[in-house]
Design a protein with these regions (language model features):
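Conserved core segment of the aminotransferase class I/II
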Residues: 6-8, 15-64
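Phosphate/diphosphate-binding loops
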Residues: 3
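PLP-dependent enzyme catalytic core of the Aspartate aminotransferase-like
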Residues: 115-118, 127-164
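Conserved PLP-binding catalytic core of the aspartate aminotransferase-like
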Residues: 68-77, 82-117, 127, 131-132, ...
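A non-catalytic, amphipathic alpha-helix used as a structural packing/dimerization or gating element
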Residues: 34, 55, 62-80, 150, ...
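Cytosolic Rossmann-like ligand/nucleotide-binding regulatory domains
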Residues: 123-124
């Protein structure tokens, strides 16, 4: 660990699983086990989740073309959404917002997208600040450009009836 006392990470993003980890000295880990409030509701990863996480790590290490395709998709969608005037914030991951800033509209837009067989999550208060409601877009390496373009086209159409 060197000069860093603690490293935390999640398996729910790039690994596509659940759970997370803490890497630290044995002494700090013991302290966290006994005194971290969040540990009360924690449980060990199931064997299935552990196997999935290990397989995801293997794919990340041995299949760089998957990561390359992911970032090609992410960059394409970011560019297209920005060209169409959508506020996508400043996230640097494959999961990023499309800012709506209205709780009611977020759910209306998500429903309209779902009718078009496009799934995005609506995120509202208290998960984000008031007036920071957003759609959460998760770009995958398995998406094709045509699918990303369908999202952009749908959002442009929906914005005509639900301005955001």
């Amino acid at each position: 660990l060197g000069q860093v006392d603690i490293i935390t990470g999640t398996f729910s993003k790039s690994f596509g699983c659940v759970g997370g980890f803490v890497a630290a000295s044995e002494k700090l880990i013991q302290y966290l086990r006994y005194y971290a409030d969040s540990n009360v509701f924690s449980a060990a990863m199931t064997p299935q989740v552990t196997a999935s996480s290990l397989k995801a790590l293997e794919l990340i290490q041995t299949r760089p073309e998957i990561r390359k395709k992911l970032w090609t998709n992410v960059n394409y969608l970011r560019k297209r959404l920005t060209e169409e005037g959508f506020d996508i914030g400043c996230s640097v991951s494959a999961i990023f917002p499309i800012m709506v800033r209205d709780n009611r509209k977020v759910y209306e837009i998500a429903r309209e997208l779902q009718k078009r067989c496009i799934f995005v999550s609506g995120i509202t208060y208290p998960a984000v600040r008031t007036k920071e409601a957003r759609l959460r877009v998760s770009v995958l390496a398995s998406h094709e450009i045509v699918q990303l373009e369908q999202l952009v086209t749908a959002l442009v159409e929906i914005r005509k009836s639900i301005p955001f």
